[in-house]
Amino acid sequence: MSKLSIVRFATCVAALTLYATGALAQGEPLKPARVTPDELKWIVGPTGNQNTLIAGDPKQAGAYVYRTRFAANFRNRPHFHPDQRVVTIMSGTLYVGYGEQFDESQLKALPAGSIFTEPARQPHFVWAKDGEVVIQVIGNGPSATTLIEQKP
């Protein structure tokens, strides 16, 4: 199975998982959208990473889908979100851990096609250790990010 097939399958599984749990059934309905990779409009976010909104709006009630492109060696300190999310690794390898402190021993390497969950209010952290990584996030807003202070 090709990497593209794995990523497509993983994205479908993530969407079906959210739908089955009722997460996509609440809030404003999605508008019809058909977007090719060339049509994505990437915007530099506050952390220097690039983001593109595919559907919905994370700041509003209802389903949303966006992608983030992490630069090589980007580390995101522990943080959490008020909503639950399912994340698919579209390209690259992302190292993901759960907990309130950034702990390299808790990281798991997730290559393209992998999926991880971000339960509501569950602290987690990521590292694009080996190079650029693109993820796709599916959630049910409204959403936000709360950073966790790190012990020295």
Q: Where do the model's predicted regions map?
A:
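Bacterial N-terminal signal peptides that target proteins for export
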Residues: 1-11
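Double-stranded beta-helix
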Residues: 31-33, 105, 125-152
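N-terminal signal peptide c-region/cleavage motif recognized by signal peptidases
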Residues: 20-22
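A short, N-terminal "cap"/entry segment at the start of jelly-roll beta-barrel domains
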Residues: 24-64, 150-152
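Short acidic-glycine-tyrosine-enriched beta hairpin
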Residues: 100-121
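Glycine- and acidic-residue-biased ligand/ion/polar-headgroup-sensing regions
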Residues: 71-74, 80-101
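Short beta-strand His + acidic residue motifs that chelate non-heme Fe in jelly-roll/DSBH
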Residues: 76-78, 96-97, 118, 123-129
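Conserved short histidine dyad/triad with adjacent acidic residue
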Residues: 64-81, 110, 119-120
